[in-house]
């Protein structure tokens, strides 16, 4: 059965629906948010560019 969880990535809220546990989805959201924040701070880029750079990294 799918679980629904609201997560925050770089201050934006997203609703995830997946068969994974809510705690796992929160952990993934936190990881993505941390990585995007690192990219934005290091490269001085906006959220969209940070998302692309995080995805390819």
Segments (PLM) and residue ranges:
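Conserved active-site motif detector
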Residues: 57
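N-terminal globular core domains of eukaryotic regulatory proteins
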Residues: 1-53
């Amino acid at each position: 059965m799918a679980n629904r969880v609201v997560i925050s990535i770089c201050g934006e809220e997203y609703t995830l629906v997946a068969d994974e546990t809510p705690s796992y989805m929160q952990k993934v959201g936190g990881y993505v948010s941390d990585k995007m924040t690192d990219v934005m701070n290091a490269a001085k880029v906006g959220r969209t560019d940070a998302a692309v750079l995080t995805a390819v990294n």
